[in-house]
Amino acid sequence: MRPLVAARRRAAACCALAACMLALAFAPAAARAERLKDLAQIQGVRDNPLIGYGLVVGLDGTGDQTMQTPFTTQTLANMLANLGISINNGSANGGGSSAMTNMQLKNVAAVMVTATLPPFARPGEAIDVTVSSLGNAKSLRGGTLLLTPLKGADGQVYALAQGNMAVGGAGASANGSRVQVNQLAAGRIAGGAIVERSVPNAVAQMNGVLQLQLNDMDYGTAQRIVSAVNSSFGAGTATALDGRTIQLTAPADSAQQVAFMARLQNLEVSPERAAAKVILNARTGSIVMNQMVTLQNCAVAHGNLSVVVNTQPVVSQPGPFSNGQTVVAQQSQIQLKQDNGSLRMVTAGANLADVVKALNSLGATPADLMSILQAMKAAGALRADLEII
């Protein structure tokens, strides 16, 4: 009897182990813990865009055609006037602006200068700038940006930009032929701007009351962050105001705030799984879906519609001695063709791999698939939100 009992126990243990392995295999994967700095950002700690208008000089004959871009010569005249040089001497007949309008400059280009002022930037810090042609310059390669003030949205000057440009493209032309690689009408200057004014510290003005803004609104993730912060710093440190904003009680002293924020940003939180969503790009035909998308059983019939337009020139020749003129006309033939589409069964998909397999079985192009997905959503077979960008 004892060997029989032992065998039964071993069999029961094996069945229990197999059941546990099956449960683990089919259980949904737990969300991976992420750092808080990857899930949210501190309100007020952000970049600030800067913009300015300036001139690039030293171009090898590839600058603006000044007869077509009068603002280039006007800007150059204003800059020279600020340097004490006047070019509007005029003539005896009173042509006060003839010198400016007759300037044929090929080595100058009007440009827009943009930069990003990082948070907590101090005067004297160097930042990168991007220089983009505003007129019809062929290339900015080899040019030098003259001193350009960069302003913020409030109209204040926050940085001054100047320096030699680095253009990633290259091009050559001869006898009407032209070869170009990459973009020649824009370039960058590494460290080309010096910060002259700092943005007021928004964190220091909050008197120890900070707010976290989640990158993606989710009530579950917000609650998990509150629980993690309160477990690490004590009860009452964090309070969720809504699904995106969390209020924090931080030390009022700036030195303690740095240590508090450094510890806070490295907290690991497991975010909630994202809502099922399908992104459709109507311009490029791209379709992206996340892992939460599922399908229900449905039948799909989709026929391709094609339009073919064939245009041929037709010459109408007048008779001899008729004083007529030869006329060239266009003769067009238009064909409209629609392929027959039969119903196809699309099986249900419980995960992303099954959904991809089911959609690929239709054999539709991305453009057709966009219409099919919208119809599936309307029929209730697609369990996801559709977003067209």
Swiss-Prot record:
The domain of life for this entry's organism is: Bacteria
Query: Which InterPro entries is this protein grouped with?
Result: Flag_FlgI
GO biological process terms, alphabetically, are:
bacterial-type flagellum-dependent cell motility
Keyword Signal part of the UniProt annotation: yes
In which compartments does the protein localize?
Periplasm; Bacterial flagellum basal body
Q: Which residues form the signal peptide?
A: 1-33
Q: What GO CC terms are in its UniProt record? A: bacterial-type flagellum basal body, distal rod, P ring; outer membrane-bounded periplasmic space
Any idea which UniProt keywords this protein has? Bacterial flagellum, Periplasm, Signal
In alphabetical order, the GO MF annotations are: structural molecule activity
What quaternary arrangement does the UniProt entry report? Answer: The basal body constitutes a major portion of the flagellar organelle and consists of four rings (L,P,S, and M) mounted on a central rod.
User: Which family does this protein fall into?
Assistant: Belongs to the FlgI family.
| Function recorded in the entry | Assembles around the rod to form the L-ring and probably protects the motor/basal body from shearing forces during rotation.
Protein name as catalogued: Flagellar P-ring protein
Whose protein is this, by species?
Answer: Burkholderia pseudomallei (strain K96243)
